[in-house]
């Protein structure tokens, strides 16, 4: 009986760990627009390329696929499709997420700020 109780408690604890793990909560797009200031030094929120590629329609787009932008081979061959999970990892630590990419940005460590920024990027359609 004691083993069954221990097993049940362990299963519940693991369930909570999975539910509360690294899953990002929905962000606030209005706050994300403010966070985008960090991105706007290199990226436009429309189709225009600058130092970085334009981010219009970035969510759902294959990485390294904006016409007219000169991507690193690492980015072009990454097989990443930008979604909440891949954007979160890349925005948190670009070099860790995709070693050898050429984006000279250290990343955003704050999970809430990343959630907000991703929510804003989702509005760029």
Give the residues covered by each predicted segment.
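Short Fe-S-cluster ligation motifs
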Residues: 67-88
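Solvent-exposed helix-loop boundary motif
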Residues: 52-53, 57-73, 92
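Post-cleavage N-terminal segment of exported redox proteins
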Residues: 1-28, 114, 120-125
């Amino acid at each position: 009986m004691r083993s069954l109780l221990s097993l049940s408690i362990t299963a519940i604890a693991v369930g909570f760990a999975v539910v509360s793990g690294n899953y990002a909560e929905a962000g606030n797009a209005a706050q994300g627009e403010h966070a985008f200031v960090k991105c706007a030094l290199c990226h436009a929120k429309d189709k225009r390329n600058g130092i970085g590629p334009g981010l219009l329609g970035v969510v759902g787009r294959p990485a390294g696929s904006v016409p007219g932008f000169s991507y690193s081979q690492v980015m072009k061959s990454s097989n990443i499709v930008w979604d909440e999970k891949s954007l979160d990892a890349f925005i948190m630590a670009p070099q860790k997420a995709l070693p050898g990419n050429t984006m000279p940005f250290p990343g955003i460590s704050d999970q809430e700020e990343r959630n907000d920024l991703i929510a804003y990027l989702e509005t760029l359609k």
